[in-house]
């Protein structure tokens, strides 16, 4: 039973944290609340420190393409089976404590009602509120383990949420490919365009420049907490500029509306807090939304 519900591994607790005055926080409930408050405020706090830009992001948005994605096509029974069986069983359960392995084993029994719910969601532009709850697990990175900033949040989403997201991902991604919207030199989070491909392309350009006895100059930027600071309103504007409109755009808008998250440490849960910006690390749609969000960066930098 433990293997089936993903609870066969020994839980490892984070180190005791320290508060603002340097005193240790040992209560798992207080540690969970400390983490949740920190993770929830990362994006808004960083966004408040960003200096106003001299130009609006709208100045760099390309004209709306002639083709548009105004609605999502329905998911078929075959597609649902392919999507669901494609998930790995090792995925930890989300807030509903239902691991994907259970969904896969019972898919033949729940396929019809699940298919109806997914297609109703896609056609109405509404994402179920029960699937907007994220369970956050703090993962230690490095340095001082008693400081919350040295942990990164991993979002454990409901298994059904991931199925919804995978259906929407495939439709948005195919539309972007068909309309050739994505910048061709964009690497990361794309099939056939990994960071390894970026290194190969970069080394090739450097080698060619050296062979031609040209001077080389490079600018490398680190986008601090990039996923956490993503502005939902800006993303939605860029999605519309890409041609994603109608109920498809409504669905994405509702996907971000009233999302909440909590941190769990052992059996202790923090208070649930609302997520007001950013995309979830651990979600399927998050990386794709981030790609669209920074799509016009080359146009901005070239000017």
Where are these regions (language model features)?
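Conserved catalytic palm subdomain of right-hand nucleotidyl-transferase polymerases, strongest
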Residues: 90-98, 147-156, 197-237
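Active-site palm subdomain of RNA-directed nucleic acid polymerases
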Residues: 168-186, 287-303
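Surface-exposed loop/turn segments and immediately adjacent short secondary-structure elements
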Residues: 2-150, 163, 269
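Short, residue-level hotspots on alpha-helical faces of the histone-fold
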Residues: 105-112, 116, 120, 162, ...
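Generic structural signal for well-ordered alpha-helical scaffold segments
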Residues: 2, 173, 203-208, 294, ...
């Amino acid at each position: 039973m433990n293997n089936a519900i993903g609870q066969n591994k020994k839980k490892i607790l984070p180190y005791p944290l320290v508060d603002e005055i340097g005193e240790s926080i040992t209560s798992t409930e207080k540690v969970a609340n400390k983490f949740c408050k920190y993770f929830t405020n990362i994006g808004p706090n960083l966004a408040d420190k960003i200096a106003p830009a001299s130009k609006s992001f709208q100045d760099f948005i390309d004209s709306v393409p002639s083709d548009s994605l105004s609605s999502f096509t329905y998911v078929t029974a075959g597609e649902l089976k392919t999507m669901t069986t494609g998930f790995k069983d090792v995925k930890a359960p989300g807030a509903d404590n239902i691991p994907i392995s259970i969904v896969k084993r019972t898919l033949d029994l729940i396929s019809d009602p699940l298919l109806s719910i997914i297609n109703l969601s896609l056609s109405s532009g509404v994402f179920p509120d029960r699937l907007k709850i994220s369970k956050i697990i703090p993962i230690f990175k490095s340095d001082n383990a008693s400081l919350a900033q040295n942990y990164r949040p991993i979002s454990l989403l409901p298994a059904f949420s991931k199925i919804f997201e995978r259906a929407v991902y495939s439709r948005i991604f195919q539309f972007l490919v068909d309309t050739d919207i994505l910048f061709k030199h964009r690497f990361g989070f794309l099939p056939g365009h990994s960071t390894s491909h970026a290194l190969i392309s970069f080394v090739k350009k450097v080698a060619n420049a050296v062979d031609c006895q040209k001077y080389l100059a490079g600018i490398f930027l680190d986008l601090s907490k990039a996923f956490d600071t993503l502005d939902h309103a800006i993303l939605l504007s860029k999605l519309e500029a890409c041609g994603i409109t109608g109920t498809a755009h409504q669905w994405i808008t509702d996907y971000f509306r009233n999302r909440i998250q909590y941190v769990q440490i052992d059996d202790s849960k923090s208070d649930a807090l609302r997520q007001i910006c950013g995309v979830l690390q651990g979600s399927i749609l998050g990386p794709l939304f981030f790609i669209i969000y920074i799509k016009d960066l080359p146009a901005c930098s070239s000017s």
